[in-house]
Amino acid sequence: MKAFLFAVLAAVLCVERAHTLICFSCSDASSNWACLTPVKCAENEEHCVTTYVGVGIGGKSGQSISKGCSPVCPSAGINLGIAAASVYCCDSFLCNISGSSSVKASYAVLALGILVSFVYVLRARE
C-alpha cells in the first residue's frame, strides 16, 4: 500500500501543470465593453495582452483596443499628447479586463494642439 501511495505521489509531482490561461480577446474595438470575450490561450502563450491606441484632435477623438494571448510580454507605451499608444501585459486568469493603464493624457499638449488648430482655422478664413 505504501509503495502504491509513493508511486501516485511521484506521478503527481512529475506531471507538468496543465496550461489554463484564459484572457479576454477582441480586435480593433472602439470600447472596452466590446472586449469581454474570454478565450483559452495556446500552450506557448503565457501572457494576456491589451493594446490601446488613442487619438484626439480638437473636439474629435477615437480609440482602438485589441486584446488577446501572447507568447511574449511587450509592455510599452508612448504619449504624444494628441496621440497615445500602449501595450500592457499580465499573466493571470482574465487579468486583461481593463484597458491599458499606462496611457495618461497630457492636457498641456492637448491644449496646445487645440490652440494651434484654432489659429490655423482663423488664418484660413483671411
Curated annotation (Swiss-Prot):
Residue ranges the record assigns to the propeptide: 99-126
Short name of any one Pfam family annotated for the protein: Toxin_TOLIP
Tissue specificity: Expressed by thymic blast cells.
Lipid attachment points (GPI-anchor amidated serine): 98
Main location: membrane
GO BP annotation list: lymphoid progenitor cell differentiation
Coiled coil: none
Positions annotated as glycosylated: 96
InterPro entries membership: Ly-6/neurotoxin-like_GPI-ap, LY6_UPA_recep-like, Snake_toxin-like_sf, Toxin/TOLIP
SMART domains: LU
Keywords, ordered alphabetically: Cell membrane, Disulfide bond, Glycoprotein, GPI-anchor, Lipoprotein, Membrane, Signal
Chain ranges of the UPAR/Ly6 domain: 21-98
One cellular component (GO) term of this entry: side of membrane
Keyword rRNA-binding: no
Signal peptide stretch: 1-20
Mode of membrane association: Lipid-anchor; GPI-anchor
Disulphide bridges, residue numbers: 23-48, 26-35, 41-69, 73-89, 90-95
Cellular compartment(s): Cell membrane
Presence of the UniProt keyword Cell cycle in the record: no
Source superkingdom: Eukaryota
Name of the protein in its database record: Lymphocyte antigen 6E
Gene name for this UniProt entry: LY6E
